[in-house]
Amino acid sequence: MRIGVVCPYSFEVPGGVQAHVVDLARALRGMGHEVAVLAPADEHTPLPDFVQPAGRALAIPYNGSVARLSFGPVSYARVRRWIREHDFDVLHLHEPIAPSLSLLALMVAEGPIVATYHTSTTKSRALNAFQVVLQPFLEKITARIAVSALARRVQVEHLGGDAVQIPNGVDVRFFADAKPLDGYPREGPTIGFVGRFTEPRKGMPVLLAAMRQLLTDMPDLRLLVVGRGDADDLRREAGPELADRIDLLGQADDETKARALSSVDVYCAPNTGGESFGIILLEAMSAGTPVVASDLDAFRRVLDDGMAGVLHPVGNPIALAGALRGVLSDPERRATLAAEGSRRAAAFDWSVVAGQVLRVYETAIAADPRHVGEAL
């Protein structure tokens, strides 16, 4: 099968949707299919050989964060040329309503089109304003996928049409085989955090407040952080009690992230909202690391209602401290959580998820057997 995939977010900055697109493409290629990906990126961005850069993107506030998106006449022309140069059996668009390449491809293309919705954010004012304009293009979508029940609910309630729920995938073996970083595991307890630590919804202030309560019982406690943000701002926020206990790796490649997850005693996701899934939880679970996470609906579903990890009330540092203490002070509980987490993660392995996506492609092609081309 010849598959075209469009990612709306720039590959110049790592993100969950970008990782999903690349991992899905690799899994499908491993199954013998031809896959080409189009995404915002400049010519100097390191990319897999199956990803074609569509030019630099602009940083735009979107979905409670800042996304790097590509839109305008130059991007439109590049999308048209890409579709014209390939003879795809199916076109797979991620986040087709984001003002970027996926929406442009939806405007340009005709034929079997599959759309995946990642976000759980309800309809924005901008989408309300352009709903009438967008609706004819949304009706071109042949089949829809939502990565979570929350994303599916947004699709059904605000965009019309149902969606098949297929979760994000994870390369379980990649994380399971990762070796700890040099100097790890330590004698004292180490908490792990991955993400843009200066972004409020990622919950770093909640985690720092919880750590302050643990220092009396755990004087050797440290925090290993992987992600983007201002290191000086983080240390100032941590204060004199915690600043020297933070090991900051900065933005890291996948191998370093996997090794970091394998190095810590517990992975903490203190997020306060805006999450539709929680792929980082699965990555930590695949690495054999116990997870403590906010009791967000998306995280609860990934953690199997708390069977595969510990959930704590959102935004409550006292409760988070108690949850972390309960895991860090009990080796048997850590081992049990690690085993349950590994079991749960196996259900999300890309070998399973890619097969589910492929069946949606087959359904879309059966409904519209034309090859993908430019709309007249």
Annotated model-derived regions:
Residues C7-P14, V21-V22, R26-V74, R228-A231:
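N-terminal strand-loop element at the rim of the active site
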Residues A41-D42, V194, R222-R235, G250:
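Glycosyltransferase donor-sugar binding loop
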Residues L150, G169:
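Carbohydrate-associated surface elements
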Residues G183-K202, L208-R212, L224:
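Conserved donor-binding/catalytic core segment of Leloir-type glycosyltransferases
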Residues V266, P290-A293:
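Short hydrophobic beta-strand element within catalytic cores of glycosyltransferases
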Residues A319, G326, R333-A347, L358-R359, ...:
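A short, well-ordered alpha-helix in the C-terminal region of glycosyltransferases
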